[in-house]
Amino acid sequence: MRQIIFHEETKTFHLYNEKISYILCVLENGHLGQLYFGKRLHDKADFSYLVEKCGRPMTSYIYEWDRTFSLEHIRQEYPVYGTTDYRHPAIELLQENGSRISEFQYESYEIIAGKPKLSGLPATYTESEEEAQTLRIFLKDALTGAKLALLYTIFDEYSAIARSAYIENAGEKNLHVLNMMSLSLDLPDKDYEWMQLSGTWSRERYIKNRTLEQGITAIDSMRGNSSHEHNPFLALKRHNTDENAGEAIGISLIYSGNFRMQAEVDTHDVTRITAGINPEGFDWKLEPGESFQTPEAVLVYSENGLNGMSQTFQKLYAKRLARGYWRDKARPILNNNWEATYFDFTEDRLVEIARKAKECGVELFVLDDGWFGARRNDRAGLGDWVANEELLPNGIKGLSERIEALGLKFGLWFEPEMVNKDSDLYRAHPDWILQTPGRNTSHGRYQYVLDFARKEVVDHIYGMMAKLLSESKISYIKWDMNRSITECYSSKLPSDRQGEVFHRYILGVYDLYERLTNEFPEVLFESCASGGGRFDPGMLYYAPQGWTSDDSDAIERLKIQYGTSMCYPLSSMGSHVSVVPNHQVFRNTPLHTRANVAYFGTFGYELDLNKLTEEEIKEVKEQITFMKEYREVLQFGTFYRLKSPFEGNETVWMVTNEDRTLAIVGYYRVLNGVNQPYSRVRLQGLNPDMVYENVWNHTENYGDELMNYGLITSDVTAGEVPGNVTPCTDFESRIYMLKGKKVQEGR
C-alpha cells in the first residue's frame, strides 16, 4: 500500500510503497533537501541523520553565523541558480533587471488521490484514485512573486516515482524561463556505472556504459526530436549489478523534443542527476499570470538488477502510459509494401501483394510512402494528403475497400509534419515552414519542416488527415518524421518568444495526435521517425507501438531490440521480417531467424510475399500461425534478458506468461564455430516447483533446474555432426517453448 506522510515537527515528506521510499525535507533556509531514494525504509518522524553538512574550505555560506550550511554541499531537491551552489541548477529564471538569482522557499503542500493530468503533455495516468497518490509541494520566490509547484506521484504496483514541475508568474513583471528540469536527484555517492541508449540511424539504442567520475556525463538532443543518437533514458547501476541482481536506478523522460539528461559528480562525490527540456536555445517568456509545465520524468528503483528495472518501466508504460482501444489488444500481423515496391507501384500491384498476404494469414496491409500528390520520388508531394489518381484511380477510399474485400484491414503512411517545395501546400503557404529570415533554409530528404508552433498549420493538416480517415476504411496509421529541425524560427512569434519554438512545435505534434486519436479511437497509430528517431515515451502515450528501426536485418535487430527493452515494452516494438539480401546491410539470414527475432515485438512482413518460393510460403504460414497463437505472451508477458549481444556471439532472451505456465526463449548465434564448448543459459521467472516440457526436444525439467543449472543450448557445433542431423550455419537461431505441466508439491 502506497503512502505519503508529512511529519510536521521535522518538515519531512516520506513517499513509500511496498518496495521503495522517497524522502525529502524542508531545509533551514526554506529550500527542499533530498534525503533518500531507494529500497523501502521504515517510516519515522526524524530523518535528519541523512542530512550531511560540515564546513569546507573555499565554500560560500548562506548565513554568517553558520559555516556548515552551504548549498554547494547539501543534497537538494530542486536546486536554483547562483546561491552558494556552483553545480548545475534545476531551474534558472531571467528577470527584467537582468538577474538570474531565485530563491524558492517552501510554502505548503497538498496530497491528492490518484494523479492529475498534465495539460497538453503526455504523462503516466491512473484509472482510479486508489492506484496512486500525488504530492504537490508549493514554493515561492518572494522577490519576483513566482510560484513553483513540484509534483510527485507514487504508485501502488510500481517501484516508480513520476515527477514534474510547474511555475506560475504571480508577480507584476515578465520572467523568462531559461532552464526548468523535470527532475533533479542528488545521490550521496558516485559509485555507479552510467548506462545510456545511443547510436544513429539504423543503429539506435545501443547500450553504452561508463563509470561516473568527477565532472559531467550527459546525453541530449537539439534536433527537435528525441533523436536516433540518444534516447531520453539513463540508468545508474552499482558496479556489481547485472541483469538479475543488484541496485539500479532508471530515469526516463516522457518527451519527444529537445532534451538533456546528465549526471554531475561534485568534488566530494555527490552525484546530481537532472533530466528535462534541453536548456540550449530554450527561453520561455512568462508574462504576469502565465504559467509553464515541464514534461514528466519517471524514476525507477530496482534491487533486482536491470531486468527488475526494465520490467517496472515495461509494465508501467504498457498499462499506464499507452492508452486507448489498442493498449491491451494483441497487435495485428501486418504486411508493409515499402521495401517490396518503394515508389514503384500501382493499385493493382498493391492488391496483388495484399492478396498473397491474406493467403498467408496476414491481417493488415499497409501502404507506405508514395500514394499522394505529385509523389513519384522523395522530391515532391509532401503536404498534399490527397491520393494520386494516376496511381490510385479509385483513391484511398477505393483501395481501402478493395483491401477490406480481401478480408484484410488497411493501413496508410503519413508524414504530417513535413512539406516539399514542389507541393500545392508550399506554393499556397511558403511562410508555413520553420525558417530564419535572411538565412538559407536547409533541407533533409528534400523536405522542410512545417511550423507546428502555429495553430492554423496544425489545423490544416488535421483537416486533411481527418477527411481521409472519415471517408476511407483506414484501420492503422504509420506516422513518420524523416528529418531533424534546422533554422528553427517561427514567423508567427515575436522575437522575445523565438526560444519557445522547439517546445511549441512538439506541443503542436502532441495536439494533432490527441485530436486524431480522440476522433478515431479504434485506429492503431504507429510512430516512426526514419525508424527509431522518435522512439520515446512521449510518442507511446499516443501511439502504442513505434517502428523500432529502419534496419530490419535480424542480426542488427538483436542489439537494437535488446537495448530498446531496457525501457520499452515488447508491445511497443515494431519488428518485421524483411527480404534478403537485407536492404540495409545486404546480409542473407535464414527466414526462420528473421522471424525468431521479429516474434518479440509487434511482428509483420516488409516484403512482397509473391516473390517467395513455395517452401518459404509454407514457412511464413507456419510463422504466422505460431505468432497468432502466442502473441499475447510475446507482446504482453514478462520479459527477461539472459545473454547480451554486446558481450558475445550469442543472444538469449525470454518471456513468460502471468502464471508462469508458459515460457518462450529466443536463442540466437551470430557466427558458427568449429568444435565449440557445451553451452547452457540460466533461465529466469519460472515456477521452481513446476515441471516444464521443452517442446524442442520433449525433455522435462523442473523450473529450479532450468533456472539454476540452465537450459542446454549446445548443438552439433559442440562435436561431430551425425549423418541424420542438418549442420548449423551462421546466423542460427532457435525458439524454445517451455510448457508447464504440473507442480510437484511437498518436495
Model-flagged regions — what are they?
Residues 420-459, 503-610:
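Glycan-recognition surfaces
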Residues 4-14, 32-264, 280, 691-705:
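Polysaccharide-binding surfaces and accessory modules of carbohydrate-active proteins
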Residues 19, 165, 289, 335, ...:
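Conserved, mostly hydrophobic/aromatic
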